[in-house]
Amino acid sequence: MKASPKKLLATLRGARHERTPLWLMRQAGRYLPEYRALRESKGGFLELCYDPEAAAEVTLQPIRRFGFDGAILFSDILVIPHALGQHLWFEAGEGPRLAPPLVDGALASLEAAPQRLDPVYATVARVAASLPPETTFLGFAGSPWTVATYMVAGRGSKDQAAARRMAFADPAAFGAIIDAIADLTVTYLSGQIEQGVDAVQLFDSWAGSLSPAQFEQWVIAPNAGIVRRLKALHPDTPVIGFPKGAGGKLRAYAEETGVDAIGLDETVDPTWADAALPSQLPVQGNLDPLALVAGGAALDAAIDRILAAFPSRPHIFNLGHGIVPDTPVAHVEHLIKRVRGG
């Protein structure tokens, strides 16, 4: 059988390459002039996410410009609560809003609308038909804990206090929210795979706000369930877990969830991660997004340190979180050249 030209996909399956594959979280976004032009023509962010032609174009823009090894689907983690029946909108300059906030049993009052995900599947099909053969196509979803923090509070927050309070005060009600998110997430990711993504990533952006016991209950257990069910349906599709802020709990996450690869945020020492994580587990990361903004010698040193930290482990170069809007395009070009040894 002919070997796949998709180096990033092969890395997720345990291969090592002379040149480290790379992509960047939020690589399709506001730092790109072509994205800003398209976003302005389409109006709101959510409208852009639900327009298959436009969302496919946004997904493809950084591939055309930079030739990344991976393309990440352009969408948002909050399409899941929208499909579960919450109202979702984005306030200019303030971020997402969801109504009603899921307190006092409000989950039971929601009327599910899974058809809201259909445009995302259409986007996946469009992108899959358009990508270069060497480019790995990555789908994604938010992990249950992170999605639940928005659903309970009705908005983003700095400390996730509303969800944390509910998890302590009424774990049965909070667990029902987690279960509803997990069930739809399996369906959603399976749909993405069926339409053509090569691998998927679970984003747990607020995993770092939990104690070890809560982390086990609300991060590890739900993600393990998603991975197990997804693998039963699609055993050959790699799953990347990204529990941002997990720190010393990363090893337990890696060992207990069953993910095929793990993403590191910028606070993790890559040398520590290489020593602490299960042998040969592929890792992804973990450049500080602000180092990419700064550029210069500091950027070069940070890139080199990460590349040197994984001498025998499969590694995908990425950021420790999403690229920020004021990142100079020239710095991204320099990053790619340095990672690829140009």
Swiss-Prot record:
Predominant place of localization: cytoplasm
Catalytic activity: uroporphyrinogen III + 4 H(+) = coproporphyrinogen III + 4 CO2
InterPro entries referenced in this protein's UniProt entry, alphabetically: UROD/MetE-like_sf, Uroporphyrinogen_deCO2ase_HemE, Uroporphyrinogen_deCOase
Recorded GO MF terms: uroporphyrinogen decarboxylase activity
Signal peptide stretch: none
Biological role: Catalyzes the decarboxylation of four acetate groups of uroporphyrinogen-III to yield coproporphyrinogen-III.
Protein name: Uroporphyrinogen decarboxylase
